[in-house]
UniProtKB/Swiss-Prot annotation:
Signal peptide: none
Annotated localization: Secreted
Similarity field: Belongs to the heat-stable enterotoxin family.
Official protein name in the record: Heat-stable enterotoxin ST-2
Function: Toxin which activates the particulate form of guanylate cyclase and increases cyclic GMP levels within the host intestinal epithelial cells.
């Protein structure tokens, strides 16, 4: 499963924030 981060990067593990 691919994890998509939200508008505000709430997860430091998030690679691509948009």
């Amino acid at each position: 499963n691919t994890f998509y981060c939200c508008e505000l990067c709430c997860n430091p593990a998030c690679a691509g924030c948009y």
